[in-house]
Amino acid sequence: MRKLWAPNWLSAKRHHANQAATRLIGRHALMAWLAAALALSAGAAQAQLNVEISGVGASQIPVATANFQGEAQAPQNLTAIIRSDLARSGRLRNVDPGGATVAESANVDLGSWKSRGADAFVAGSVTPSGNGQYEVRFRLYDTVKGQSLGGLAFNVNQGQLRVTAHKIADYIYEKLLGERGVFATRLSYVSRVGGRYQLLISDSDGQNSQVALTSNEPIISPSWSPDGRRVAYVSFEAKKPVVYVHDLATGKRTLVSNQKGNNSAPSWSPDGQHLAVALSRDGNTQVYQVNADGSGIRRLTRSSAIDTEPQYSPDGKSIYFTSDRGGAPQVYRMPAGGEEAGSAQRVTFKGSYNVSPRISPDGKYLAYITRSGGFKLQLQDLTNGDVTSLTDTSNDEAPSFAANGKYILYATRVGGRSVLAAVSTDGRTRQVLSLQSGDVREPSWGPFMQ
């Protein structure tokens, strides 16, 4: 069997135990375990989020969010979460409300808030409604035009207060910028503490993490279903890589692919009915399609090369994948029906080593990792072929688009530490999430919640 072009990314300590699978997973070089970037669900330090903003200046919209009336009696500080969300957007800027507490029902002097430098103002309230329930209300104002931009009311339990704050931030983002926010979306990643591996799900800011699965063997390649209810991943619990689908609400797992050899790199079709996977059952790793219940397996690529890391296009008509069929790894595109339906076409031409393709939700951009004095996150315009380098780090890996296509989550090293990071697609805003202890890898940004 041919040796895979991707060098070993597992630590030397675990190299021999996972050598066969490592040769076939199709990950780019230096896929090392990342220092923890997100909080564990229990007993761990909370994630620390640092936001670096450059080159935006006056283009940021200034927003003042007053303290919500009654929130001091609630177990979550909603306004703190809202302000944090707005700040990390890179496109909205917080204006200090000076400690003011204002309910959404108040008669607001918008002129006074404009004089403080705010173009938008947010007021709200949190009211206990019995049996652990809370009523959360808010209203958004345009201080420049002197008018209301609407608001919402929520009846939620204690555990839903945090996501409610994210939804309020999403509302503000959309009303002021004209596009959907992603604060209420979720992240998935794999944590390792000692010899224990955990698949975790967290809020988009790295907080409120929950354990979906714990294993004594590695878990890799989490991939969200389009409806955000399931995550596909690869588990080594059978002493080889096997693909499962995990229902996050029930905890039920479905074995999707346990073919001869290695089963890796699952990617959902846009309709949630199928998964593209990389299998070595017939020799070299090739791309296959399988139904989400594990039935109906079908081979899609038919080359003598290594074909791996498949990704469906948002319209479901194409599959992007990594292949060394030209002598070195590059990104290719083929019809979703496979190479029998049409030949694969090379997509990346800048650089001699390009891997880990991810397509933006609108299908217009390709994020990938190039090897050029290190491993760097790139963004390619699929219309004109223009390529932009989004980071100044040299150990980037595992890119994943936010649901609105405006940000990319990835793993890298900063200041000698391994971290998770997110960068806006214009390169102006960077967020770094770090944790004091533990390892984490393979981040994946979830879809809009339905």
Swiss-Prot record:
Superkingdom field: Bacteria
Keyword Cell cycle annotated: yes
Single GO cellular component term: periplasmic space
Entry keyword set: Cell cycle, Cell division, Periplasm, Signal
Alphabetical GO biological process terms: cell division; protein import
Entry annotated with the keyword Cell division: yes
Signal peptide: 1-47
Location(s) in or outside the cell: Periplasm
InterPro entries with a match to the protein in the record: 6-blade_b-propeller_TolB-like (IPR011042), PD40 (IPR011659), Tol-Pal_TolB (IPR014167), TolB_N (IPR007195)
Family: Belongs to the TolB family.
Purpose: Part of the Tol-Pal system, which plays a role in outer membrane invagination during cell division and is important for maintaining outer membrane integrity.
Binding partners and assembly: The Tol-Pal system is composed of five core proteins: the inner membrane proteins TolA, TolQ and TolR, the periplasmic protein TolB and the outer membrane protein Pal. They form a network linking the inner and outer membranes and the peptidoglycan layer.
PANTHER family hit by this protein: PROTEIN TOLB (PTHR36842:SF1), PROTEIN TOLB HOMOLOG (PTHR36842)
Protein name: Tol-Pal system protein TolB
Source species of the chain: Cupriavidus pinatubonensis (strain JMP 134 / LMG 1197) (Cupriavidus necator (strain JMP 134))
Annotated gene: tolB
